[in-house]
């Protein structure tokens, strides 16, 4: 379930209140999690009490939060003072803010349909990642040479490891210790893409997003995911050979940071 509020809104677990963009109602478990979380926000949120009821007043934080129970809170920017807010317009502003912060330049031809989308922020990020990944797979993922060692090869390819070969046990004289460079798509960029794809596939609630991600998973079945993908982003190459990968990298970073424990605890604020 996703709760939609504006920045500076109140959050409570009191179900007798009337919910709206200025007041969000969450479960007691989520409210308790938010109370713990707000202590790390350095004064950008505060706990207030009204008629014996506890509320959390949000600060200037905008973006998307997801509690450990799976309850989501979409926090939209205020765009008008003293007037009724339009969630669609607010989400449009939030997406522009996100694009500017991440250095993302959307394609002009897709801007209109992108802004008409009613997807929550996180689902929109998933769909944009998949859109870029579909294009990459269509063009062809880049491969690279990787050194492979085979201690039980039936034939000689590449370089024979003489020292190990002369110590070969009797009866295995026809098996070879070899090293060779294999041209494979198992480069770090592709493995990060596969890891992010797994996150999207397990997290999305949108049918179309799930179908697209499933198709891509089958197409990338030979590529192994990588552990601790967020820290591996520093190994991502920005050379000319990977020019087509530059547009998808910010989307990978956004998704990986969302699923990073430090981000879930408020380490990143937007």
Predicted segment positions?
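Helix-loop junctions and short alpha-helical segments
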Residues: 234, 238-242
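Terminal, charged accessory segments of proteins
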Residues: 1-231, 244-262
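Long, well-ordered mid-to-C-terminal structural blocks that present hydrophobic/aromatic surfaces
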Residues: 266-270
């Amino acid at each position: 379930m996703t709760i939609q509020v504006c920045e500076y809104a109140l959050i409570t677990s009191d179900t007798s209140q009337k919910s709206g963009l200025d007041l969000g109602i969450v479960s007691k478990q989520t409210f308790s999690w938010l109370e713990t979380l707000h202590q790390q926000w350095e004064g950008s949120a505060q706990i207030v009490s009204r008629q014996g009821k506890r509320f959390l007043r949000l600060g200037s934080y905008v973006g998307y939060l997801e509690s450990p129970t799976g309850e989501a809170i979409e926090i939209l920017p205020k765009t008008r003072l003293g007037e009724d807010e339009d969630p669609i317009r607010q989400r449009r502003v939030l997406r522009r803010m996100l694009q500017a912060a991440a250095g993302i330049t959307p394609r002009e031809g897709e801007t209109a349909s992108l802004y008409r989308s009613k997807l929550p922020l996180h689902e929109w990020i998933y769909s944009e990642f998949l859109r870029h990944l579909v294009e990459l797979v269509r063009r062809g993922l880049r491969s690279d040479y990787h050194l492979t060692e085979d201690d039980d090869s039936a034939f000689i390819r590449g370089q024979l490891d003489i020292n190990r070969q002369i110590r070969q046990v009797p009866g295995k004289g026809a098996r070879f210790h070899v090293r060779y460079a294999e041209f494979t798509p198992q480069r770090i960029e592709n493995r990060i893409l596969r890891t992010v794809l797994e996150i999207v596939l397990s997290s999305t609630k949108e049918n179309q997003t799930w179908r697209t991600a499933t198709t891509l998973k089958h197409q990338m079945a030979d590529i192994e995911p990588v552990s601790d993908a967020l820290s591996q982003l520093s190994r991502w190459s920005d050379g000319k050979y990977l020019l087509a990968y530059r547009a998808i990298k910010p989307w990978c970073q956004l998704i990986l940071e969302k699923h990073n424990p430090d981000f879930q605890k408020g380490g990143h604020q937007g």
